Swiss-Prot record:
Name of the featured protein: Imidazolonepropionase
Signal peptide (UniProt feature, chain positions): none
Domain of life: Bacteria
HAMAP family recorded: HutI
Protein function: Catalyzes the hydrolytic cleavage of the carbon-nitrogen bond in imidazolone-5-propanoate to yield N-formimidoyl-L-glutamate. It is the third step in the universal histidine degradation pathway.
Protein localization: Cytoplasm
Family: Belongs to the metallo-dependent hydrolases superfamily. HutI family.
Documented EC number(s): 3.5.2.7
Record organism: Streptomyces coelicolor (strain ATCC BAA-471 / A3(2) / M145)
Name of the gene this protein is made from: hutI
Binding site for 4-imidazolone-5-propanoate: R81, Y139, H166, Q232, S308
Length: 391
């Protein structure tokens, strides 16, 4: 039998269970404790009521919240696009290939190089409180390169997404229909065994609504669950397609009609917002307030990728969401934990309740609000993943 540990003297415990504590969506418990046994939470509540345990950890009056759930990232890549970012931020034209630059570098990298990069970024995210990671392929765009990326990812996370439909592969740029046939045929056959999800970039210059529907429908037929890059750069069919196909998440959601917002609010599809992308491209911010007020479920994620959002920091994204997207600190923290779990259709992460994984983030602050109140400050003082302290 596993030994038990109580983490006690917690100033403010975010459980994301509204039946607990202050009965808010965060289920905030003051002067709290958490009991962990093995890889699971077995008890949460007030410190004075905590059961006896084998071990004790003193939180010393600091805040504890669920480990962040980063439900959208692109960590399987090689190369660097510093010059592109520098030119964009300096207002200079830049003619290099964008995603295609990363595709070329990723194809040229060895498996060991891809894995080293992935593990480096995962460790970086873990140090900042992220305990559940989704990541995608999408920088290979050949059957061999997409499938090897997914095999590498599957060694490190259960949340692996096949994104062969990121852009049309450069060698088939003049024949996008042939590339869709490749993605839905040979490439899907090779990639489906290594992924849980299928994704598509539904946007002008990438894949239109009909192409996206064909790709996601083919993936569903192979047992992959759909998610979609939707309505990032322009108004389009992505969000409504996500709802139609019961996608777990529609990601970006910057350009939304009233009908798009209503569709999300009346569905299980989560609107995953990615403020790192807007920060890094100086683009229009998504209107989180509009979505939340309409009743949509919102998640916050990093979109960590080498081109448009090279950050693995969920705390940074929380601060951006509060400052620039109309979210309250409570809403942003919920969206980065329970919201991310909803975007992955998970109930065992993003919450600190009996039966959930013991994924906890300890802050060097008395309240979760400090994540937005003190942007840029390294507040994460400890991280437990599956009951084991990692930081």
């Amino acid at each position: 039998m596993s030994s038990s540990t109580v983490i006690t003297n917690i100033a403010a415990l975010v459980t994301n269970d509204p039946s607990l504590g202050d009965h808010s969506p965060l289920g905030l418990v003051r002067d709290a404790a958490v009991v962990v046994e093995g890889d699971r939470v077995v008890w949460t509540g007030e410190s004075s009521k905590a059961p006896a345990t084998d071990n004790r950890v003193d939180a010393d009056g600091r805040a504890v919240l669920p480990g962040f759930v980063d439900s959208h990232s692109h960590l399987l890549f090689a190369g660097d696009r510093t010059e592109e970012f520098n030119a964009r931020m300096s207002g200079r034209p830049y003619s290099a290939g964008g995603i295609r630059t990363t595709v070329a570098a990723t194809r040229a990298a060895s498996d060991a190089e891809l894995e080293a990069g992935l593990t480096r970024y995962l460790a970086e995210a873990l140090r900042q409180g992220t305990t559940t990671f989704e990541t995608k392929s999408g920088y290979g765009l050949t059957t061999a390169d997409e499938s090897r990326a997914l095999r590498v990812a599957a060694r490190h996370t259960d949340e692996v997404t096949f994104l062969g439909a990121h852009i049309v592969a450069p060698e088939l740029a003049d024949d996008p229909a042939a590339y869709v046939d490749l993605v839905t045929g040979e490439m899907l056959d090779a990639c489906a065994p290594h992924a849980r999800w299928i994704d598509v970039f539904c946007e002008k210059g990438a894949f239109d609504g009909d192409q996206a529907r064909a790709i996601l429908t083919a993936g569903k037929a192979r047992g992959l669950h759909p998610r979609i890059h939707a309505n990032q750069l322009s108004y389009g069919p992505g969000v409504r397609l996500a709802v139609e196909l019961d996608a777990a998440s529609a990601d970006h959601c910057t350009h939304l009609t009233d009908a798009d917002v209503d569709a999300l609010a009346n569905s299980r599809t989560v609107a995953t917002l990615l403020p790192g992308a807007e920060f890094s491209t100086r683009a229009q911010w998504p209107d989180a307030r509009r979505l939340i007020d309409a009743g949509a479920t919102v998640a916050l994620s990093t979109d960590c990728n080498p081109g448009s959002s090279f950050t693995s920091s969920v705390p940074f994204c929380i601060a951006l969401a509060v400052r620039d997207m109309g979210m309250t600190p409570d809403e942003a923290v919920w969206s980065a934990t329970a919201g991310g779990a909803a975007a992955l259709r998970r109930e065992d992460v993003g919450r600190l309740v009996p039966g959930a994984y013991a994924d906890l983030t300890l802050l060097d602050a008395p309240s979760h609000v400090h994540l937005a109140y003190r942007p840029g400050v390294p507040l994460v003082a400890g991280v437990w993943r599956r009951g084991v302290r990692k930081v």
